[in-house]
Swiss-Prot record:
TM region(s), chain numbering: 524-544
Gene: Dcbld2
Protein name: Discoidin, CUB and LCCL domain-containing protein 2
Single GO MF descriptor: signaling receptor activity
SUPFAM superfamilies per record: Galactose-binding domain-like (SSF49785), LCCL domain (SSF69848), Spermadhesin, CUB domain (SSF49854)
PANTHER family: DISCOIDIN, CUB AND LCCL DOMAIN-CONTAINING PROTEIN 2, F5/8 TYPE C DOMAIN-CONTAINING PROTEIN
Comp. bias (Low complexity): 1-29
Cytoplasmic side: 545-769
Length: 769
């Protein structure tokens, strides 16, 4: 019985109370309106008991029996059932019995979305009973009644069959009930009334039963923009095309922040109403196979669109009008395709060139306000070769699927195929229309590749004779009154759509929901693009980090006060340019300690030499008599010009063996190193060629005056000069040194100036000797 077709309860149009018409089985209808119930307390229960007795004695006429049945859809794996008039008050003295069967070996779970049955008589006349099994061998699971009863726990059967019995007697209120069922393995079953407010998770997956297209429920919103949080989940899923009303199915929901406005649309026979601001909305996760297949974009060429006939005429201005098949492109300006004839034999055909997975179709009317033409209902046929056609039916259905069309000439209406169609050719066969058959179409779907084999490519249909309706239409003659052309009838039976009165064979519907494999190019791009993006991002980060680290390293290396010179190598290079001296002089260099002046500003003190470096300024040699004196103990300052006038304090070293040209200053006085001055009394100043000003620097921009007396040179010197050199005591306001006195100066910063000056002065010194 798993292949049993879903059934819906039918209501008689003559019965305003909504009671079901008697089944066409030859049995008499149950007594209803002509019977008056007895007052309470006087055999008031005799009528319900009589109805129940008659119901049990009648032969089985289907899955439901009685006059108390409401909205009912009983599917092979799930379904929905309600009491009569739900959600309004159910009438007095009604009865309904539902017999539910699923696949052998399965069990059934029942869950109530709403339960409101009056319990004033302690479940004596108004109640709901559930039984294990069907028929006389059934056993009772439970008897239920109560207004606003919260039945949160589901009820499970012991076998694959259950019976649900609803009885109503005399009562004053009560909406009745709404229940849903499914096989036992659907652990996440929900009812048709559940909304997102019943769940706390931002994302979740639930199973919707069949039959959730409720006539009394309302939804707001559309896909992909989202649905208002007050919309029932399963009914919104039907509108979105992710679940079938006949079969039910799994839905995946994502909750997000609401929007101020929700638009209205018609899809899958569900009308979405306009909605306003809500705190949240929800959308559905889909397989992604809902893209357009090329009618609007032009991927489907004009020759791939054909029709049974074409509406052509000449207007009062003498202009020809032809609403050809290639005009049936959705959202393209201009007129639509329109058929010349107005019968159910007309069709619009689309060739996709190869098999594709078709998941939906969108239609609209003429889109012209002066031509209120549209198709309100249609069938869909499909084929692999364009010759043998199959009418689309829902799984397990015995009748062709009639799709809800448009209700006006300009709004879009969407219908989804569940399960999808796998075919190359699609035909739309209108069965109802407004004035004339006119429509624009777009197909939804994606590429189809069955795992394990290549896509099936079919050859185009062979050319037919001139009477083929798809290829030939009679064009009107020019200059005559408006004239309509009628296509000739086809000779081949395969070209003619099925008449409504004809009996059709069971279609070979490809009931498969296999997700198509993505083509190699798409899969390769999906993998390479993220990898390339990540690789480029990583490379950029590495380059930025390396550049930043290098800048920091350079900055750290540039914070030294003075560079460190190799004393030994520099000293040996200088000695080669000077006359030989005694070893004693070379082994007694003067060193000055580095006072912690590096923490002072450049204007306060000058930069001092490092404590472990004995670096001396080269002497300036003039035309003097005697041997070359020991070089000056002053070190040139890097990065500063000779005119910089900051003081450079030095700590005088205390040594037992004094340098030949320097003596320590008294402890009480300022400690300044002074230049070594040679006695020039016996020589001409013109031969020296050096200025007589001192190169000592003072605080300020003016050069200091040289004053003081000269001390005699020590006996360790190599010079025999008659003059005596003395240390100068720094005192302000003294006159400058005499021009005849030779002073040592700080060498120039550039190598060229120092080298040239040294050569010239050394030559002058040799000439003097």
């Amino acid at each position: 019985m798993a292949s049993r077709a879903p059934l819906r309860a039918a209501r008689s149009p003559q019965d305003p109370g909504g009671r079901a018409a008697p089944a066409a089985t030859g049995r008499a209808p149950l007594p209803s309106a002509g019977w008056c119930p007895l007052p309470p307390g006087r055999n008031s229960s005799s009528r319900p008991r009589l109805l129940l007795l008659l119901l049990l004695l009648l032969p089985d006429a289907g899955a439901q029996k009685g006059d108390g049945c409401g909205h009912t859809v009983l599917g092979p794996e799930s379904g929905t059932l309600t009491s009569i008039n739900y959600p309004h008050t159910y009438p007095n003295s009604t009865v309904c019995k539902w017999e539910i069967r699923v696949k052998t070996g399965e069990r059934i779970r029942i869950k109530f979305g709403d339960f409101d049955i009056e319990d004033s008589d302690y479940c004596h006349l108004n109640y709901l009973k559930i039984f294990n099994g069907i028929g006389v061998s059934r056993t009772e699971i439970g008897k239920y009644c109560g207004l606003g009863l919260q039945m949160n726990q589901s009820i499970e059967s012991k076998g694959s069959e259950i019976t649900v019995l609803f009885m109503s007697g005399i009562h004053a209120s009560g909406r009745g009930f709404l229940a849903s069922y499914s096989v036992i393995d659907k652990q996440d079953l929900i009812t048709c009334l559940d909304t997102v407010s019943n769940f706390l998770e931002p994302e979740f997956s639930k199973y919707c039963p069949a039959g959730c297209l409720l006539p009394f429920a309302e939804i707001s919103g559309t896909i992909p923009h989202g649905y208002r949080d007050s919309s029932p989940l399963c009914m919104a899923g039907i509108h979105a095309g992710v679940v079938s009303d006949v079969l039910g199915g799994q839905i995946s929901v994502v909750i997000s922040k609401g929007t101020p406005y929700y638009e209205s649309s018609l899809a899958n026979n569900v009308t979405s109403m306009v909605g306003y601001l809500s705190t949240s909305l929800f959308t559905f996760k889909t397989s992604g196979c809902y893209g357009t297949l090329g009618m609007e974009s032009g991927v489907i060429a004009d020759p791939q669109i054909t029709a049974s006939s074409v509406l052509e005429w000449t207007d009062h201005m003498g202009q020809e009008n032809s609403w050809k098949p290639e005009k049936a492109r959705l959202r393209k300006p201009g007129p639509p395709w329109a058929a010349f004839a107005t019968d159910e034999h007309q069709w619009l055909q689309i060739d996709l060139n190869k098999e594709k997975k078709i998941t939906g179709i969108v239609t609209t009317g003429s889109t012209l306000i002066e031509h209120n033409y549209y198709v309100s209902a249609y069938r869909v046929l499909y084929s692999d070769d364009g010759q043998k056609w199959t009418v689309y039916r829902e799984p397990g259905a015995a009748q062709d699927k009639i799709f809800q069309g448009n209700k006006d000439y300009h709004k879009d209406v969407r219908n989804n195929f569940l399960p999808p169609i796998i075919a190359r050719f699609i035909r739309v066969n209108p069965v109802q229309w407004q004035q004339k058959i006119a429509m624009k179409v777009e197909l939804l779907g994606c590429q189809f590749t069955l795992k394990g084999r290549l896509p099936k490519l079919t050859q185009p249909p062979p050319p037919r004779n001139s009477n083929n309706l798809k290829n030939t239409t009679v064009h009107p003659k020019l200059g005559r009154a408006p004239k309509f052309t009628q296509a000739l009838q086809p000779r081949s039976r395969n070209d003619l759509p099925l008449l409504p009165a004809q009996t059709t064979a069971t279609p070979d519907v490809k009931n498969t929901t296999v997700t198509p494999s993505v083509t190699k190019d798409v899969a390769l791009a999906a993998v390479l693009v993220p990898v390339l993006v990540m690789a480029l991002t990583t490379l950029i980060l590495i380059l930025v980090c390396a550049w930043h680290w290098r800048n920091r390293k350079k900055k750290a290396e540039g914070t030294y006060d003075l560079p460190h010179w190799d004393r030994a190598g520099w000293w040996k290079g200088v000695k080669q340019l000077l006359p030989a001296k005694s070893v004693e002089h070379e082994e007694t260099p003067v060193r000055y300690s580095n006072s912690e002046v590096s923490h002072l500003s450049p204007r306060e003190v000058t930069t001092v030499l490092q404590a472990d470096s004995a670096e001396y300024a080269q002497p300036l040699v003039g035309g003097i008599v005697g041997t070359l004196h020991q070089r000056s103990t002053f070190k040139p300052e890097e990065g500063k010009e000779a005119s910089y006038a900051d003081l450079d304090p030095y700590n005088a070293p205390v040594q037992e063996v004094y340098h030949a040209y320097a003596e320590p200053l008294p402890v009480t006085g300022p400690e300044y190193a002074t230049p070594i001055v040679m006695d020039m009394s016996g020589h001409s100043t013109a031969s020296v060629g050096l200025p007589s000003t001192s190169t000592f620097r003072t605080a300020g921009n003016q050069p200091p005056a040289l004053v003081g007396t000269y001390n005699t040179l020590l006996s360790r010197t190599d010079s025999c000069s008659s003059g005596q050199a003395q240390y100068d005591t720094p005192k302000g306001g003294k006159p400058a040194a005499a021009p005849e006195e030779l002073v040592y100066q700080v060498p120039q910063s550039t190598q060229e100036a120092s080298g040239a000056g040294r050569d010239e002065k050394f030559d002058a010194f040799k000439e003097t000797l």
